[in-house]
């Protein structure tokens, strides 16, 4: 946020500026623990994001908002209201549980009778869910995510090497040592 009113950058562009932003640019995290923490900046971000995606020509569209399973109905309603009040020409607004959206996004057959474990590690939360027969059998939102892992990396580097590193460097270290996909590592668990 530049000069407390204009969004200067968001997403990856904003992350590149993290820990390097000048004094007139404030880094904002409008979501915290899976819920809206800063409604004003979230509204501005939604407008900018949709405008960028549609190249300024906003046409009526269906909106599907993926939300954590363990949040309250009031918190879910806040996401719905955010889109409804954003004046983005929504034909339909659907709030869907994130675990189902994650499963579909990973091309998992969520309607299968065999249970599927989905673990979504986010910035400050981790959602662990078991999906079966098109629904969520069990889901828990844990208030620990990549940010806490990064802090653990920072503390370990400080303790072991007497070296201070920033959050972005810690995130890079975490991602390089914790990426299961690159080395083809995985696990099949029966029980």
Language-model-detected regions and their locations in the chain:
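Nucleotide/phosphate-binding catalytic cleft detector across ATP-hydrolyzing
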Residues: 1-123, 130-191
């Amino acid at each position: 946020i530049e000069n407390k009113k204009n969004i200067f950058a968001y997403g990856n562009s904003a992350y590149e500026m993290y820990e390097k932003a000048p004094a007139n640019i404030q880094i904002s995290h409008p979501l915290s623990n899976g819920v809206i923490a800063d409604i004003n900046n979230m509204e501005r971000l939604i407008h900018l994001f949709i405008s960028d995606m549609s190249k300024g020509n906003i046409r009526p569209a269906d909106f599907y908002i993926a939300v954590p399973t363990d949040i309250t109905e009031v918190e879910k309603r806040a996401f719905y209201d955010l889109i409804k009040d954003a004046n983005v020409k929504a034909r339909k607004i659907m709030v869907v549980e994130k675990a189902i959206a994650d499963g579909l996004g990973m091309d998992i057959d969520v309607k299968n009778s065999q249970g599927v474990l989905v673990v979504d590690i986010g910035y400050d939360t981790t959602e662990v869910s078991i999906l079966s027969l098109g629904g969520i059998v069990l889901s828990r939102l844990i208030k620990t995510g990549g940010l806490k892992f990064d802090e653990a990396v920072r503390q370990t580097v400080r303790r072991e090497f007497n070296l201070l590193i920033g959050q972005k460097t810690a995130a890079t270290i975490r991602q390089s040592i914790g990426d299961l996909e690159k080395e083809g590592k995985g696990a099949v668990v029966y029980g």
